[in-house]
């Protein structure tokens, strides 16, 4: 396990096995990163939101690029997510899927094994289908990452009172 500088890891997050977390990453409450059969790499300025599961299989590691946002309750399983992408809440990325730079996966979408979602494309549904590709999609993803960088800093700086029992 390797953890970079200026990283926020919530007390209720669980990180197991071969996991590399680069600088300025946020791992939020209830997230599980389990690199037990292969490796997980989380790129700089990425955020793994509440109750996300990141896992691998023997053939597929999980690779998240820089400034990637993985929304609440999503599952990323043996997938590759390139820079500035946004994975919507409750969505599922199955083994061998590839999410290219600036792509957005809509909430609740299921990206099937081996599927590629192109650069700056929005994909929704089950199974996920591309509905639009343009620069505005990539801009939305990039801005989400910036929002979470500010939020992560507030958590690191102790701006929020936390209660647990």
Where are these regions (language model features)?
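N-terminal segments that cap or nucleate solenoid repeat domains
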Residues: 1-27
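Glycine-rich hexapeptide-repeat left-handed beta-helix
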Residues: 1-3, 36-44, 50-52, 56, ...
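Short N-terminal helix-initiation segments at or just after the protein's N-terminus
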Residues: 13-17, 67-72
């Amino acid at each position: 396990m390797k953890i970079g500088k200026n990283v926020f890891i919530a007390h209720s997050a669980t990180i197991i096995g071969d996991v590399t977390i680069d600088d300025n990453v946020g791992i939020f409450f209830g997230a599980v990163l389990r690199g037990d059969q292969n490796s997980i790499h989380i790129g700089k300025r990425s955020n793994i939101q509440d109750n996300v599961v990141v896992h691998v299989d023997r053939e597929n590691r999980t690779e998240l690029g820089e400034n990637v946002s993985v929304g609440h309750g999503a599952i990323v399983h043996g997938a590759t997510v390139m820079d500035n992408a946004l994975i919507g809440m409750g969505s599922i990325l199955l083994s061998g899927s590839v999410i290219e730079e600036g792509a957005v996966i809509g909430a609740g979408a299921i990206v099937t094994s081996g599927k590629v979602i192109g650069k700056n494309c929005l994909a929704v549904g089950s199974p996920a289908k591309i509905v639009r590709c343009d620069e505005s999609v990539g801009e939305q993803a990039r801005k989400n990452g910036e929002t979470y960088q500010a939020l992560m800093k507030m958590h690191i700086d102790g701006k929020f009172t936390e209660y647990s029992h």
